[in-house]
Amino acid sequence: MELDVLTAISPIDGRYRGKTKALAAYFSEFALIKYRVQVEVEYFITLCELPLPQLKGIDSGVFETLRNIYRNFSEADAQRIKDIESVTNHDVKAVEYFLKEEFDKLGGMDDYKEFIHFGLTSQDINNTSVPLSIKEALEKEYYPQVEELIAQLKTYATEWADIPMLAKTHGQPASPTRLGKEIMVFVYRLERQLATLKACPVTAKFGGATGNYNAHHVAYPQYDWKQFGNRFVKEKLGLEREEYTTQISNYDNLSAIFDAMKRINTVMIDMNRDFWQYISMEYFKQKIKAGEVGSSAMPHKVNPIDFENAEGNLGIATSILEHLAVKLPVSRLQRDLTDSTVLRNVGVPFGHIVIAIQSSLKGLRKLLLNEPAIYRDLDNCWSVVAEAIQTILRREAYPHPYEALKALTRTNQAITESSIKEFIEGLNVSEDIKKELRAITPHTYTGL
């Protein structure tokens, strides 16, 4: 079977391709090859700018032509590299040979071809290409989508800022809150964790076969290759070079990024579960789309499937991010190859997260506030004003206020407005205090 949305093994590239296709520009095989070509070209240009003595003859006017190799990189170019790899059995060496072919097409570059990939090991290319792809995916896809989710939550938090709502701790009625405030909890958490993620530096390894610039230094000992590497990685790639490494990246900063993404996932899971619960409690109804079916057996069903879909995808993403975070920083001695296949899966959690965010947004935008259900719960739970009453009585030095309210409310009998009012009338306090207590209701006792 040919690969398409019906035959793909992963639902990211199958069922959910419409939601994840933008990520192909960062995490597909094509994208990885293109990023490698970009790094190799920019490295060659930077050697020319140094300049190495053997590269002084290159006219800087050719640099933009060289950059067009990756700017105009096509699927045919990527296939040519794959064809070369079928012979070399080495993906990065195939990129080098492809670039030598491209230099031949330009003409006049024959004397300079051996400075493609000069002094480098494959991981100098991989450990710059992959971080660059992650950085750009975060900036162009991930951050905007998380921020869109936050913006939607803020809209609801503002719209429903004054809606009183019965809180639930341990699944039981607790001091009332406001719906808008509870949504703002998720805004606050997401914003803080997103800021933490954005503060994580995206770093790259660039230092030769074992991280010491051995080949560079033996060929050109007169140059400060560490400074060269720092400048190249920062100015040409927008990354931060790891100063001390083995053959491969330390991956500590990538691990920090993945851990930060996990925390954001955790907040989103919590949010999706809460909205799922509010729908179950009938605090929200859902917009119904004509023609849709909620159950193959029960015609009446309108299920919170978007929140469930989001939760499931976030769980998968978190599991993969956890493996990335704990596995990548561990490699035998100066390196083993276990990071290679793991890095090829970096895009997978991004895919599941994008699916989850879009499902969350779809679910949120289907919500219809059901105020009667919210107010009914408040009206049926007058026991929650007990905290307010006993606190005011404490203020007034009333004897044993907590115990008095406990005796009234911690029973299996229904606590109603009338029973609370009756209790207030029986208190040995001034009329002003009784008036203050009468004003407290489940609708008004919502704090700040």
What are these regions (language model features)?
Residues 158-161, 202, 276, 283, ...:
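Alpha-helical coiled-coil oligomerization motifs
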Residues 223-247, 251:
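Active-site-adjacent "gating/activation" loops or surface patches in catalytic cores
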Residues 42-46, 98, 102, 137, ...:
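Generic, well-ordered alpha-helical scaffold segments in large soluble proteins
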Residues 193, 240-242, 246-332:
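Glycine-rich anion/phosphate-binding loop at the beta-strand->alpha-helix junction
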Residues 2-29, 64-71, 293-448:
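Catalytic-core signal marking the mid-to-C-terminal active-site face
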Residues 135-143, 147-150, 154, 184-187, ...:
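Short amphipathic alpha-helical segments with heptad-repeat character
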Residues 2-213, 220-232, 294, 307-309, ...:
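A helix-coil-helix interface module used to build multimeric assemblies
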Residues 104-110, 198-201, 280-283, 318-322, ...:
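Proline-centered turn/helix-capping motifs that create local helix->coil transitions or kinks
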